[in-house]
């Protein structure tokens, strides 16, 4: 579990110190909205694995914020540096995600990451860690709860309930599609609690996942390719 990545400078590779670092970085998370009402670029990120887990495969998709059409797709591959440890996903996946970010030709105004934001036992899921490291506004979109509790949201698309941990809200349980389990939506960095919900709703189409992470999930999991429209460079870009 040793790593030489500068993102984890000072980490000795132990689980105990990783959790301590999470608590320190969580204090740097900003939960105020820093996203324009009319952003131009969104990005979605997700991670998969190859070679029996020996290679981490990070997918990045850049989208037009107005049309939600993809503008760029990229894959970054790095050697997997540590095994899966519950609650420490970012220490396993962040190096590949940062390499995928570096492949984008333009900087996104808002990032969606498949994983937790602050809906995490130490309030530093991968979307929060990514946001603190990069300074980019981030939202975490997870398929399962990692921390806290919530009342089941109503059955209709858009129904939502707060996720609470120790009396404080850490995210939302959002019914993004009827007859599907709710998504776990939480701010990662430089996005408010309400902003995380609003932006997720704005980027939903006919599927359970919002478009940024849905497209990234297709690339990362190899379930399908993402086609960039020929000659399309973005709405008013």
From Swiss-Prot:
Pfam families: Endonuclease_5. One of its GO terms (molecular function) is magnesium ion binding. It comes from the Bacteria. CDD domains: Endonuclease_V. It is found in: Cytoplasm. GO terms for cellular component: cytoplasm. Gene3D superfamilies: archaeoglobus fulgidus dsm 4304 superfamily. Keywords: Cytoplasm, DNA damage, DNA repair, Endonuclease, Hydrolase, Magnesium, Metal-binding, Nuclease. Its cofactor is Mg(2+). Belongs to the endonuclease V family. DNA repair enzyme involved in the repair of deaminated bases. Selectively cleaves double-stranded DNA at the second phosphodiester bond 3' to a deoxyinosine leaving behind the intact lesion on the nicked DNA. This is Endonuclease V.
